[in-house]
Amino acid sequence: LMEKVEKACLALTEKGLPHPTSFEVETAAAFLYFKEENCDVVLLETGMGGREDATNLITHPLCSVITSISMDHMQFLGNTLSEIASAKAGIIKENCPVVSSWQEDVVTEVLVKEAERLRAQLYQPKKDAIRDLLYDMNGMQFDYVSEDNSQWKIKLPLTGAYQAANAACAL
C-alpha cells in the first residue's frame, strides 16, 4: 500500500511539484486502503478541517459533521473565529446534511449562511440536550434529550464536556 503511495509522491516531485505533507501521504494511503477494501461506508476525520484539508476531496459525503470551532490553526485558517469558521465550513457540500456542535454565535452565522448557500440542511443538537453530566473514574455519563424530547442515558469511557458535545452530534 505504502509503496503505491510512495510511487505517486515520487511522480509528483519529478514533475516539480512539492512532496505531499505527512498528513497528505497518510490520507492518500487511507483512501487507497478504503478503495482496495471496497468499504461501503467510511467515517473520515479531517486534519485541520476545512476547505483546504486533504480529506476534502470527497464530493458527495452522506453527511458532514463540524465539531466545536475555536481559535486554532490560525496560521492556516485565519485570525478570527469568523475566518476560521469560513475555512472549516468548506466541508459543507451541496444538498448534503451537515451536523454542527454548539458554536459561538459568529460561527453559527457563518455555518448557517454556507449551509443555506449550498442548500444543505444544518442540524444542531438542542442547547440543553446534555443534562446531568457526571464524571467518575470510568468516564462520564449524562442524559441526552433529543429534538422530540426522547431521553437516553449515555455512558462514555471519555471525559470532558466537549466529548459530550461530540456525542450529541453523533446522536
Predicted region positions:
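ATP-dependent carboxylate-amine ligase catalytic core
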Residues: L1-T59, Q75-L77, D105-V106
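Acidic, Mg2+-coordinating active-site environments of NTP-dependent enzymes
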Residues: L12-E14, E37-E45, P61-L62, I66-K153, ...
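A generic structural signal for residues located within well-ordered alpha-helices
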Residues: F23-E26, A87, A165
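Gly/Ser/Thr-rich beta-alpha loop segments that engage phosphate groups in nucleotides
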Residues: G49-E52, T80, I92, Y162
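Hydrophobic alpha-helical scaffolding
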Residues: S101, G160-Q163
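A short glycine-threonine-serine/GTX helix/turn-capping micro-motif
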Residues: K153-A161
